[in-house]
């Protein structure tokens, strides 16, 4: 459960404001837009807002060089309704998405290797009669991409990315499925690949191992990295003569606390040598965790690394001068899956 819906918005703006008279005489190109939304991170999780334990140099640089919105609030304290307020522009009291209602309850199960998963997954759909952000921007000439968590409709509903103005999608249709960082499948919609609807892309290496227990960590296809790489590949295909908008809705640092055992994690394991463990909660798809503090801190530093890679890609492509980058969280900090906000002094 999230303690607060207060969030942090940072913008890195690569286009200068021009005098009105000059704008009237000169055709100013539409700015590209990247909207980076992480999951269950409070403003107190960032070094630029006083976090003493977690290293976030790239986001800190955004804060120094861009603009901070210190009185910004998320639309809701949980995933689906918070995203609904963003996508619809409605107050949460006006949109009918009021919670993380799951549409997989009672549906048949399908087999993925030795694992069973739901035949249909997702949340309450957005009203198809109400225009949402990707549709609005597409109507204004933008190429649109969404990478990460959707939570705006269930598979086969009237509100999946392919029906809502999105040219390319890769990630989780369902917020509950995103509780597994090593999932059985991810969802995809790509016109370039010939998709006519959202499909499932099976994680063939993952399904060779169980979803729960010690052997779960033998799974190697880490969704956060896979989704981020898909976003970078999409960004690499963009050109300066066609405006684009990308919604990169990262699942980090939402529970479960799981990630590759690499140098990012090892550094925090050394830092928090005396650490906590957590026993897991299978009903919510949270596996048991050791080194909970190190895991959580490493997830945020990993996210920060991804942000740095995005800025590097923009510069490499020569797109950094005409791209607005916005960074925020869907809501405040969480206590799920072994996370310990009190240890980090988080808000």
Region annotations inferred by a language model:
Residues 28-31, 38-53, 70, 100-102, ...:
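Active-site-proximal cap/lid insertion segments
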Residues 24, 43-132, 136, 142-145, ...:
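Active-site segment of extracytoplasmic enzymes that catalyze sulfate/phosphate-ester chemistry
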Residues 34, 143-145, 246:
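Conserved beta-strand elements of the Class I
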Residues 1-29:
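Bacterial Sec-dependent N-terminal signal peptides
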Residues 32, 58, 132, 161, ...:
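Amphipathic alpha-helical recognition patches that constitute DNA-binding helices
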Residues 32-34, 85:
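Residues embedded in well-ordered beta-strands
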């Amino acid at each position: 459960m999230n303690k607060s819906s207060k969030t942090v918005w940072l913008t890195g703006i690569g286009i200068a404001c021009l005098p009105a008279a000059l704008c009237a005489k000169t055709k100013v190109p539409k700015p590209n837009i990247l909207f980076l939304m992480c999951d269950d991170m409070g403003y107190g999780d960032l070094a630029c807002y006083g976090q003493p334990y977690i290293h976030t140099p790239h986001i800190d640089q955004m804060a120094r060089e861009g603009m901070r919105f210190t009185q910004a609030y998320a639309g809701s304290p949980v995933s689906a309704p918070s995203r609904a307020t963003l996508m619809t522009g409605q107050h949460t009291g006006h949109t009918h998405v009021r919670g993380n209602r799951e549409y997989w309850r009672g549906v048949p199960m399908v087999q993925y290797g030795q694992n069973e998963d739901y035949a249909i997954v997702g949340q309450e759909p957005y009203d198809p009669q109400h225009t949402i952000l990707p549709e609005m921007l597409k109507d204004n000439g933008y190429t649109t991409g969404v990478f990460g968590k959707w939570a705006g409709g269930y598979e086969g509903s009237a509100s999946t990315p392919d029906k809502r103005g999105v040219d390319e999608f890769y990630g989780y249709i369902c917020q509950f499925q995103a509780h597994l960082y090593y999932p059985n499948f991810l969802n995809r919609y790509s016109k370039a690949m010939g998709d006519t609807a959202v499909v499932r892309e099976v994680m063939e290496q993952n399904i060779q191992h169980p979803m729960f227990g010690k052997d779960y960590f033998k799974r190697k296809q880490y969704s956060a990295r896979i989704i981020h790489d898909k976003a970078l590949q999409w960004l690499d295909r963009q050109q300066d003569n066609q405006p684009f908008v990308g919604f990169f809705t990262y699942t980090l640092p939402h529970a479960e606390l799981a990630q590759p055992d690499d140098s990012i994690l090892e550094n925090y394991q050394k830092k928090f040598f005396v650490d906590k463990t957590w026993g897991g909660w299978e009903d919510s798809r949270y596996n048991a965790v050791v080194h909970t503090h190190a895991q959580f801190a490493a997830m945020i530093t990993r996210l920060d690394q991804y942000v740095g890679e995005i800025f590097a890609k923009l510069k490499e492509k020569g797109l950094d001068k005409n791209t607005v980058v916005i960074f925020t969280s869907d809501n405040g900090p969480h206590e799920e899956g072994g996370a310990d906000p009190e240890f980090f002094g988080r808000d």
